Regions:
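Flexible, solvent-exposed coil segments and beta strand-coil junctions
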Residues: 46-50, 226-234, 276-280, 318-325, ...
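Extended beta-strand-rich architecture
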Residues: 221-225, 235-253, 429, 455-476
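Secondary-structure transition/capping motifs at alpha-helix termini
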Residues: 195-200, 224-230, 256-265, 306, ...
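Transmembrane beta-strand segments of outer-membrane beta-barrel domains in Gram-negative
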Residues: 74, 164, 287-476
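Transmembrane beta-barrel architecture of outer membranes
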Residues: 97-99, 170, 188, 217-219, ...
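Predominantly transmembrane beta-strands of Gram-negative outer membrane beta-barrel pores used
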Residues: 233-240, 246-305
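Outer-membrane beta-barrel pore domains and translocons
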Residues: 105, 131, 176, 207-209, ...
Length: 476
């Protein structure tokens, strides 16, 4: 490297890297001591990241270790870890070529002071216990006074009467009796149970089944800590934007969990904003001339509500949910002022990692304008054009003007428009002016009329972002 002193106590370092001749893989050998793992490896051997003829790259070896570990641990190899995989690289008597020997050793354990090995086993699940009201200071075992409910080969334990419908919880569990141990199923189960929003992040642990003499079986214990049935979150913020110079925003949300004993959640959110904006028409010169408030109701079901089964289209591994929401909002800002009523019935699911899908089966909005008389105060350009046209005709009704010869809002503006568009009126204007006045009127009608909107929407989003530190990603 070169060091360039650019100033006192500062330097620039320039690294020059000269790469050597690349090495290529000319042979590949595998030795797997455990028969169960060897058979498992052969089923996905074609997916290897290390192939004869490819350039030697460390990243490919790291990827292969991850691939094999994931494959084994998702198919019963409960005790397997990455450190059991090693590679011997042979470059003796080879020119720019390497021979690769991958070794997967047996399971190592200690018995007293002696280190021993034995072949890896593939473990099956012999039982699934779900502890529905676990607390951190509680011993992780069923208490003698625990109540147990058995449903579809799941054992649900509770202190007292079970607060949930068994199906609501077991639907979120992908670890099943008779299935192989799988890291993927642990991750999927944790995600689904968290998505229910009635429990904290679950703890999932495995123990050897003492009843199995072959020691090939595991008992899965899922510990669920209930969140409070009622929670209230409030906030108060001071805001500033290009529309609102100063604002005070307050929000408050009440969440009610497990509403119908099926892990449903019901949210009631109220919000209010009072602010000041000098960009709005403000004839009374009030400092606070913006007022908005609203109320939103949202009912969340952790499943798809449909009159037919959707399991084949949207399997539960996609963590589907149904949301019914309704809202009311009112806006008073010395403008037209609006009321907005919304009702949405939507489905949500995640087809793959980092993707999300939403389908609004029904989206209804009713928008009501409350202060249509203020239209020409808000849309001053339309008013100025109309006022200029009215003053250009001497026979315009003088009652339409104030003392400064400006059209009076609203009696003067509407009266002038009606006279121009009325074929029986004595006020005669040019065809071009009549067309312009008609356009102003149509725009006024369009922007002041109430609207009832029915819609269905489908949205899909995807991102490659892995975490908050990932700076090289895309999303759409």
């Amino acid at each position: 490297y070169d060091i360039d002193s650019i100033s006192e106590k500062k330097a620039k370092i320039k690294y020059t890297v000269n790469t050597g001749t690349a090495f290529f893989i000319d042979s590949l050998k595998t030795t797997i001591l455990s028969p169960a793992l060897d058979s498992l490896y052969q089923t996905r051997k074609s997916n290897t990241e290390i192939k004869i003829g490819n350039q030697y790259k460390t990243e490919n070896f790291n990827s292969e270790i991850g691939r094999i570990t994931s494959h084994f641990r998702n198919n019963g190899a409960y005790l397997f870890q990455q450190n059991y995989i090693s590679f011997d690289i042979d470059t003796i008597n080879k020119k720019n070529k390497v021979g690769v020997h991958m070794k997967i050793s047996d399971y190592e354990y200690r018995e007293g002071d002696t280190s021993k090995t034995k072949p890896f086993k593939l473990y099956k699940i012999s039982g699934v216990n779900i502890h529905t009201d676990y607390t951190p200071n509680q011993a992780k075992q069923e208490k003698k006074d625990s109540l147990r409910v058995t449903y579809n080969n799941f054992n649900l334990f509770s202190q007292g009467k079970l607060k949930y419908k068994p199906k609501a919880i077991t639907n979120a569990v992908f670890i099943t009796k008779g299935g192989l141990f799988s890291d993927y199923k642990i991750t999927l189960t944790s995600r689904y149970l968290t998505n229910l929003r009635v429990f904290n992040y679950p703890s999932i642990q495995y123990d050897l089944d003492p009843k199995d003499s072959t020691q090939n079986s595991l008992i899965a214990n899922i510990y669920l800590t209930q969140r409070k049935k009622y929670s209230l979150i409030s906030s108060l913020d001071l805001t500033h934007s290009n529309i609102q110079d100063f604002g005070i925003l307050g929000t408050s949300t009440l969440s009610i969990r497990n509403v119908f004993n099926g892990a449903e959640t019901f949210d009631i959110a109220a919000r209010g904003n009072i602010g000041s904006s000098k960009n709005l028409a403000n004839p009374s010169d009030n400092f606070f001339n913006v007022l908005e408030y609203g109320l939103d109701l949202k009912l969340h079901f952790p499943r798809i509500f449909m009159f037919f089964s959707t399991e084949k289209i949207i399997p539960k591994s996609m963590i589907p949910s149904t949301v019914l929401s309704s809202g009311y909002a009112k806006q008073t800002n010395i403008g037209l002022d609006k009321e907005n009523f919304t009702t949405i019935f939507s489905y949500n699911w995640t087809p793959k990692r980092n993707t999300s899908t939403r389908f609004d089966l029904l989206n209804i909005q009713f928008i009501r304008n409350l202060n249509t008389r203020n239209y020409f105060n808000v849309y001053s350009s339309s008013y100025n054009a109309l006022n200029e046209l009215a003053n250009s005709y001497p026979n315009t009704n003088p009652a339409y003007f104030d003392g400064d010869k400006n059209l009076i809002i609203e009696s003067g503006t509407d009266g002038f428009i009606n006279d121009v568009l009325n074929p029986n009126s004595s006020l005669i204007v040019t065809t071009e002016d009549k067309k312009e006045i008609n356009n102003i009127n149509e725009r006024k009608i369009r922007l002041t009329e109430n609207n009832l909107i029915f819609a269905s929407n489908f949205s899909f989003s995807k991102t490659t972002k892995n975490d908050i530190k990932d700076e090289t990603y895309y999303g759409f």
